[in-house]
Amino acid sequence: MAKEYSRTQRIGDQMQRELAQLIRREVKDPRVGLVTITAVEVSRDVGHAKIFITVMGQDNAEDIAQSIKVLNAAAGFLRMQLAREMKLRSVPQLHFHYDESVVRGAHLSALIERAVAEDNQHVAAAEPEDTKE
């Protein structure tokens, strides 16, 4: 049986696709790097939308904050373009946020790899002692 999605989830999914194309095509500001929209959360009343993004090639907080600032400044323009593309009665106000889950995931992955490497070293160090007995 197909999974049911709420109206706000369907709107969020469509907004994610449309915004990705609009940002790539229409936002020409050099301060905005390669933006990836990771998620869109639309409020129940469809009045506001949180757009979570990551920016490829920008690792320091200042560059990321600058990209967010530029996108929030362009939110009105992007909202107007979305209205043309999506044909909704009312298009939500756009609020861009940095998605830290990717950075957090990379950090956790590095911690796991380090723990596995240390465990392998302990196992390798313990093996010669076992073979001597």
Swiss-Prot record:
GO terms, molecular function: ribosomal small subunit binding
InterPro entries: KH_dom-like_a/b, RbfA, RbfA_dom_sf, Ribosome-bd_factorA_CS
Keywords, comma-separated and alphabetical: Cytoplasm, Ribosome biogenesis
Localization annotation: Cytoplasm
Biological process according to GO: maturation of SSU-rRNA
GO cellular component: cytosol
Main location: cytoplasm
Pfam families (UniProt xref): RBFA
Family recorded in the similarity comment: Belongs to the RbfA family.
Role, per record: One of several proteins that assist in the late maturation steps of the functional core of the 30S ribosomal subunit. Associates with free 30S ribosomal subunits (but not with 30S subunits that are part of 70S ribosomes or polysomes). Required for efficient processing of 16S rRNA. May interact with the 5'-terminal helix region of 16S rRNA.
Subunit details: Monomer. Binds 30S ribosomal subunits, but not 50S ribosomal subunits or 70S ribosomes.
Record-given protein name: Ribosome-binding factor A
Gene behind the chain: rbfA
